[in-house]
């Protein structure tokens, strides 16, 4: 209720201030009994105010500071600094990918389908493979498959660790199912021939 009360007070203040409108002396010819006209006052004729003067008065900046601020804003708007920021952001994201990958591989409570949804690939649907996050997901799945291959995990263990057993008949539609098929191929390829 308090925000509404504050907004109501602000609205009342604005309405009260609108009665103090400046009027040109040449346009107000007579005094009327109208309540609003009594509050009108004549505008003082002065030197033409520039918009910079208003900024200086409102913000307390001098002309040089305002000029520097405008120049920086123009550079930002033209995109010179944004390309530098984008490059820095891409570099930071690349360094963070390795950290996320190590964190996901270390944790036993993180599953591939969770990683798939955390990377926002679930929402993309069929176009997920063209996303840059899909490359990170592929790195994660390759590292996970390599780990299972090194430990010679059974296909049942991999099936359960991918939580495909909980999906039942819907397991082939899961994003983790192709990973299970890849593991089966490598598992049977590495089996000795009888």
Curated annotation (Swiss-Prot):
Its main location: secreted. Residues 1-23 form the signal peptide. The keyword Transmembrane does not apply. The keyword Secreted applies. It comes from the Eukaryota. GO terms for cellular component: extracellular region; host cell plasma membrane; membrane. Effector that suppresses plant defense responses during the early stages of pathogen infection. Suppresses cell death induced by effectors and PAMPs in plant hosts. Avh240 dimerizes and localizes at the plasma membrane to interfere with aspartic protease AP1 secretion, which presents an effective mechanism by which effector proteins suppress plant apoplastic immunity. Belongs to the RxLR effector family. This is RxLR effector protein Avh240. It comes from Phytophthora sojae (strain P6497). The lineage of its organism: Eukaryota, Sar, Stramenopiles, Oomycota, Peronosporales.
């Amino acid at each position: 209720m308090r925000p509404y009360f504050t907004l109501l007070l602000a609205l009342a203040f604005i309405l009260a201030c609108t009665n103090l409108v400046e009027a040109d002396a040449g346009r107000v010819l007579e005094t009327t009994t109208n309540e609003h006209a009594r509050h009108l006052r004549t505008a003082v004729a002065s030197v033409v105010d520039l918009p910079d003067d208003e900024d200086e008065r409102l913000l307390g900046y001098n002309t040089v500071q305002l000029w520097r601020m405008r120049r920086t804003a123009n550079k930002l708007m033209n995109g010179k600094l944004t390309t530098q920021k984008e490059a820095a952001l891409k570099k930071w994201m690349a360094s963070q990918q390795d950290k996320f990958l190590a964190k996901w591989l270390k944790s036993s409570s993180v599953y591939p389908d969770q990683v798939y949804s955390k990377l926002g690939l679930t929402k993309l649907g069929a176009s997920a493979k063209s996303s840059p996050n899909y490359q990170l997901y592929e790195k994660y799945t390759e590292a996970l498959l390599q780990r299972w291959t090194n430990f010679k995990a059974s296909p049942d263990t991999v099936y359960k660790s991918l939580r495909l057993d909980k999906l039942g008949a819907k397991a082939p539609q899961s994003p983790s199912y192709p990973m299970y098929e890849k593991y089966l191929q490598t598992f049977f390829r590495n089996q000795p021939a009888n």
